[in-house]
A protein has these predicted regions:
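Hydrophobic, aromatic-rich transmembrane alpha-helices
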Residues: 105-120, 297-320
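A membrane-periplasm/extracellular boundary helix in multi-pass inner-membrane enzymes
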Residues: 59-66, 142, 159-214, 230-235, ...
């Protein structure tokens, strides 16, 4: 409200500005040490727990959303809005919990950052692979297909950083696991409906509701594309329409009376179910989002930025011997690679993209600066030298 919004939107560009501000802030932050950067994957994992409680609470008890929203924004607004429109008992849709996927991804990345694949068969590391599977299960339990896709890309990027082209060997294993899950569904097991929705793109005897809702989501995205190029793109093709929108538009999703009024206004509009998402700068389609907000000019710069992100992160790990790759390198490439690919293929939201990408690339940049100064650092006092973590092949005592 201090920023002028009357609903849950209206000033999305403020979040973008905050995300972008991490570039100069983290780049110039004093006192950031080598060992601090190696703790980032652990901090990321611990931070993923923050959203769990409020999102679970507001998913299963949607009426608590307005109360939680007063102090924290990590609530399931979609479930609250669906309840206002009559989704009692969940008969209108499958409840999805994105915080579970965030936790699962962070768990998998923490394992891969601190425990390289070549050590997994050691007796004290046999728990790592089950934890990676658990991370994938949490992504599936979230109900979001794009998180399954991104988790797979994150695992591949992390393994590429430590075992290079041997990481391609995981592809047959992943395909076999997918076929096994599909073959057992409906015959030996009935997986939770959210898992079935997330995995419905694979062959299998999936629940009709899960398949239907997933297909409807795909069709919905196609309508987003059609409407954007039909009615919105030509309005500002070069520079886009900006990030600001009328904040009163978002009120229809959280106010029962306004929702009914909006439904009457939408009568006869074949794009009524997708129009508000474009107008509120939340089209769920990456290419549409960047063209809508910044136009062709901004899209050219954005694509160049994305290519630079991938080149910089992969170059960092490629020029480092596999046994010497550090946790911050693994974490950075595992964050950047899936989110860039997913933005252009399965799901794209510019705000969420920048919130994750800007800190990740800046922390990797700080690491590279420190690495360049390592000879000078190692020439310092023995106390300073002993403060550096051991190479990846010899983990510190706390993780060995």
């Amino acid at each position: 409200k201090l920023l002028g919004g009357t609903g849950w939107g209206g000033r999305r560009y403020f979040k973008v500005a905050l995300a972008a501000s991490t570039l100069p802030l983290l780049s110039s932050f004093p006192g950031l040490k080598w060992q601090d950067l190696q703790k980032v994957p652990l901090a990321y994992f611990l931070g993923s727990f923050v959203d769990i409680v409020p999102e679970l609470l507001t998913t299963f008890i949607p009426a608590t959303a307005p109360l939680v929203w007063r102090v924290y924004s990590g609530v399931n607004l979609g479930e609250y809005g669906a309840t206002l429109q009559g989704n009692y008992g969940g008969e209108q849709g499958i409840s999805r919990i994105g915080a579970l996927a965030k936790l699962g991804t962070a768990m998998g990345l923490a394992c891969l950052c601190y425990f390289p694949p070549r050590t997994w068969l050691r007796p004290d590391r046999l728990w790592v692979l089950p934890n990676l599977i658990l991370g994938g299960l949490l992504c599936a339990l979230s109900g979001f297909r794009n998180y399954i896709f991104r988790y797979g890309l994150a695992l591949f990027a992390a393994m590429f950083a430590t075992v290079r082209f041997q990481s391609f060997l995981i592809l047959p294993l992943v395909a076999s696991a997918a076929l096994l899950i599909g073959a057992t569904q409906g015959k030996l097991f009935n997986y939770p409906i959210t898992v079935q929705r997330a995995l419905s793109f694979m062959p299998g005897n999936w629940d009709f509701k899960a398949v239907h809702e997933a297909k409807a989501s795909t069709d919905w995205r196609k309508k987003i594309d059609d409407l954007f190029y039909k009615e919105y793109f030509d309005k500002a093709p070069l520079l886009g329409q900006g990030y600001h929108f009328d904040p009163s538009l978002s009120m229809a999703a959280t106010d029962a009376f306004l929702a009914v009024a909006q439904a009457k206004m939408n009568e006869g509009d074949e794009y009524a179910d997708v129009r508000s998402f474009i107008e509120m700068r939340q089209p769920h389609e990456g290419p549409v989002h960047i063209l809508l907000v910044t136009g062709v000019v901004g899209a050219v710069f954005f694509v160049t930025f994305c290519v630079a992100l991938l080149l910089y992160s992969f170059r960092s790990v490629i020029k480092t011997p596999p046994r010497e790759v550090t946790p911050i390198q693994i974490w950075s490439v595992s964050i950047l690679f899936p989110i860039v690919v997913a933005f252009f293929t399965v799901f794209g939201d510019l705000t969420n993209f920048l919130i994750q990408v800007c800190p990740a690339i800046t922390l990797l940049y700080r690491f590279e600066l420190l690495r360049q100064s390592l000879p000078q650092l190692h020439a310092s006092t023995p106390e300073e030298m002993s403060s550096f973590p051991a190479p990846h092949s010899a983990p510190p005592a706390s993780t060995s």
